[in-house]
């Protein structure tokens, strides 16, 4: 089954299910994508941190925390969340605000934002608090008959359940939905070419961008005239504009230009390149006929933490003596086979899985020591491992599509652990271009 070209660009070359795609469209309205955070936190009534439940509709998480900080007249650093949620979605999550009076929250009136005080804590809301997310997602505008829709949903679900889940790919959001450039920038950084990296991010045009944006990028790409570029770059391209301002003041300091960006953004470039390599290794492993749910000698296996989630810091290599015991743990969901997100100090598999990993690194000419980035140590990565299989048990229902008269909609519900992508599950059902899912 043919995979969309844009997915091939991010290292995804296959589907794990053989059933024909449902087609359809996601996010026709915001409520079609509902996300509820699952955490292990229980709040009390004491502590410096005010803990709130945040329900937001069609808000970017970072934009919202910036807005809240402005209203409350506090530093944005005092507001923390356990995870960034989708923008075009209805999402529920916990946030914490340091040293703020609960009464001040009552004065916040933002469209499509609801804040409810849950209590206080001595500890801020952090990434470690997040277990996962519950999703309820509506696929609309499906052209098949009711009988065909039920059949396709049932067959795909049965395939997913039979293989205990889907490949744990990094989804298109990791790379940029309209402009999948993150991993290309990261590759140039790891290769030590900061000029190429900066120009890719600032000036590489993509066909699905608005025309004025494409033209502005093309101008800077051809002329390297950042002063003129600032005059024509749309104001919403704030990160690119900040980098150009730095380069006007500090010509040729391409490495330094990245450090004017928010830390979570500039770290995403190297992570994006690692994610691209991981996606390719995962596909090659499947093409080689290696299981994602049964270890072979040489596999690096990680174990579950106290919450039952994969812990990539606890790994062990399967040997002739241990592989059967490890597979018993894998069947009980207490252990998980992994693939590398390579860095300058990564543990690689041996045996046949190791050959797959090494072949991809050789083919891509990945300079592992390049992940130790002297110019910008903040971007360096020693690497880690990530579980190959995204264990998921989707449930579905079919109903009349009230937004598209005469058609039906499918509603999927499932839970995913943190760090995984709902679109990785949805792509197996829909089998469409990722832009129809964004």
From Swiss-Prot:
The active site is at 86 (nucleophile). GO terms for molecular function: RNA binding; tRNA pseudouridine(13) synthase activity. The keyword Glycosyltransferase does not apply. InterPro entries: PsdUridine_synth_cat_dom_sf (IPR020103), PsdUridine_synth_TruD (IPR001656), PsdUridine_synth_TruD_CS (IPR020119), PsdUridine_synth_TruD_insert (IPR011760), TruD_catalytic (IPR042214). It comes from the Archaea. CDD domains: PSTD1. Keywords: Isomerase, tRNA processing. Residues 165-390 form the TRUD domain. One of its GO terms (biological process) is tRNA pseudouridine synthesis. Its EC number is 5.4.99.27. It catalyses: uridine(13) in tRNA = pseudouridine(13) in tRNA. It is an enzyme of class 5 (isomerase). Gene3D superfamilies: 1.10.1510.30, 3.30.70.3160, TruD, catalytic domain. The keyword Oxidoreductase does not apply. Could be responsible for synthesis of pseudouridine from uracil-13 in transfer RNAs. PANTHER family: PSEUDOURIDYLATE SYNTHASE PUS7L (PTHR13326:SF21), TRNA PSEUDOURIDINE SYNTHASE D (PTHR13326). Belongs to the pseudouridine synthase TruD family. This is Probable tRNA pseudouridine synthase D. It comes from Methanosarcina barkeri (strain Fusaro / DSM 804).
